[in-house]
Amino acid sequence: MKIVLNKCFGGFELSHVACLYLCELKGIDVHSYLAESKNDTYHFKKIDKSYKKSNVFECVWYLKNELPKMELSLEENWDFLEHIDLDFDGANRADLDLIRTVEIFGEAANPIYSKLTIVEIPDGNDFIIHENDGFESVVYGQNLGKA
């Protein structure tokens, strides 16, 4: 069984273009925005596949619907926002679409502080991912349970 781990300090994250591709594989219509907070207002800029994060503090939002406007204050009703949650915890690291995305994009699947690597463990094993400041390792076996 293949699983995806992050093998550098920083954290598990997909690059923007890899994230868009993964959404496409899953049949999710996605609208991506660069979000910046100033005082009590969020400013948004629509981004496409060519966008590359230039620093770790940039925040990209993946939404199910287009935003009706490019500025939203904290006092407004935000109920219309539907974030796309690509959960990369636990068993989801063996997700076939995630593995395919990392295989296809290779190094381009990595943003600034990730080095995604596909590792193989014997089929039928449970696994637990251990993380130290973003750097991950895996323990696998039968009936691992929870500690």
Each language-model region and where it sits:
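Catalytic phosphate/metal-binding cores of nucleic-acid and nucleotide-processing enzymes, i.e., regions
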Residues: M1-A147
